[in-house]
Curated annotation (Swiss-Prot):
It comes from Shewanella sp. (strain W3-18-1). GO terms for molecular function: nucleic acid binding; tRNA (adenine-N6)-methyltransferase activity. Pfam families: MTS. This is tRNA1(Val) (adenine(37)-N6)-methyltransferase. GO terms for cellular component: cytoplasm. SUPFAM superfamilies: S-adenosyl-L-methionine-dependent methyltransferases.
């Protein structure tokens, strides 16, 4: 289906995953202020790359493995106001991260990674690839971020809360460290079901990671003031 934001349009019909609230929240939240080179891992429709282009003056590289999704991503980029600053690489992040030209190249890396680590895969193969870690495990993702992130760079991710324990274990074995964590509650009064993660390649940090919460909707189903403030530059009706 098609999705129109305030400054760009997304056609995600041929992508494994449709435009999601997760992607919008991540794309609006990631701190991109000083970034000059941004990498969007597993770009899909290109939504994160396009949001990053709207929010920064950076050059953006989107990498997408799936052929059909890459075509949709390229189309969405070409139709946007920032086509000159966004380029698409079709292939795997595992391969790109080994290329010498990308070692320590990116100031910011953004990713809404696959999140089903086990269990039955989705019937539709594209959707399965987008949703399951078989194509990109957390271990591979962290290794790629380590390779591609500049020494003072940041990486922004969104994960299901139930994946956090395993993710933290793998993170402890990497050279990356926490900067900030935001637990996301879909509705006021419910338990958090997602977590925004901000990581850095800086080692031996002396500052404790910042921890906070974000509630998306109040008990009546309306967007919370925090959600409105976060996404008002993107959603048409805010």
């Amino acid at each position: 289906m098609a999705f129109t934001f305030k400054q760009f349009h997304i056609d995600d019909l041929n992508c494994g995953m449709a435009v999601s609230t997760d992607a919008v929240v991540l794309g609006a939240w990631a701190p991109l202020t000083n970034a000059k080179q941004i990498l969007d891992i597993g770009a899909g429709s290109g939504i994160l790359g396009l949001m990053a282009a709207q929010r920064s003056q950076a050059n953006i590289t989107c990498i997408e493995l799936d052929d059909t999704a890459a075509i949709a991503c390229q189309h969405n980029i070409a139709q946007s106001p920032w086509a000159s600053r966004i380029r698409l690489v079709q292939g795997s992040i595992q391969q790109l991260s080994q290329a010498e030209e990308y070692q320590g190249y990116f100031d910011h890396i953004i990713c809404n990674p696959p999140y089903f680590e086990h269990g039955p895969q989705a019937q539709l193969s594209q959707r399965a690839m987008a949703r399951h870690t078989d194509q990109l495990s957390f271990n591979e993702l962290l290794a790629a971020i380590e390779q591609c992130l500049s020494p003072n760079g940041l990486a922004s991710l969104i994960l299901p809360i139930q994946s956090l324990h395993n993710f933290n274990h793998l993170l402890s074995q990497s050279r990356l460290e926490w900067v900030e964590r935001v637990d996301i509650k879909s509705v006021e009064g419910k338990r958090a079901n997602r977590v925004l993660c901000l990581l850095t390649a800086q080692t031996h940090r002396t500052v404790e990671p910042k921890v906070s919460e974000l509630t998306l909707r109040d008990t009546s189903g309306q967007y919370s003031q925090a959600m409105v403030h976060l996404t008002q530059d993107f959603y048409l009706k805010l």
